[in-house]
Amino acid sequence: GAETPFLRSKKLSNHYTTSTEAVIDSIKKISSESEKYHCCIYPTAILTQKKDLVNGYKKIKITKADYLIPVTSYDYSPLRPLEKFGSNWIKFKYNKYKKTRSQDLPELFHDTGTFYFYKTSVLLKNKGNLPLKTTYIMIDRIRTTDINEPQDLKIAKLQYNLLKSIKKNGR
């Protein structure tokens, strides 16, 4: 049922166009450069809740940030990855951390790939470069999956059903 007010130009209709390029193009096409903030919601943000958007908008305004990114914690430390070499072997990517217990490594976060808030003037000027005044809201890992592959969609469906069950049973 949704209507599309415009289509991307051929130049921006490829697998190499960044989200930022598409958002800037959209802002210009709808002549909304004078709006203070814009929000980009990804179509794969199926676990995003209204409260996430409301809290994100409130936080970017209150903190006077230039960008707001929803983040979540890694379920494992990205500082202890293994990489393949040859056809049968793996090794630590970072020898510095190979003897460090994962619980002793700093907690790191990644964006959820669900939505972003931008101060319009900064977005148009920086063209996607992350400004120093970037804030965040924390999203529970159970409510986020960056959907890029068919397996990611299966995981998101499992998460959705789990969240639905938790809500139904009041847990």
Question: Where are the language model's segments positioned?
Answer:
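Short, structured coil segments at secondary-structure junctions
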Residues: 1-2, 85
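Short phosphate-binding loop-to-helix
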Residues: 2-39, 47-55
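A short acidic, often aromatic-flanked loop/helix-cap motif at beta-alpha or helix-coil junctions
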Residues: 11-15, 76-77, 142-145
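Conserved core of the sugar-phosphate nucleotidyltransferase
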Residues: 16-21, 46-133, 138
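Hydrophobic helical membrane-anchoring modules
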Residues: 136-138, 143-171
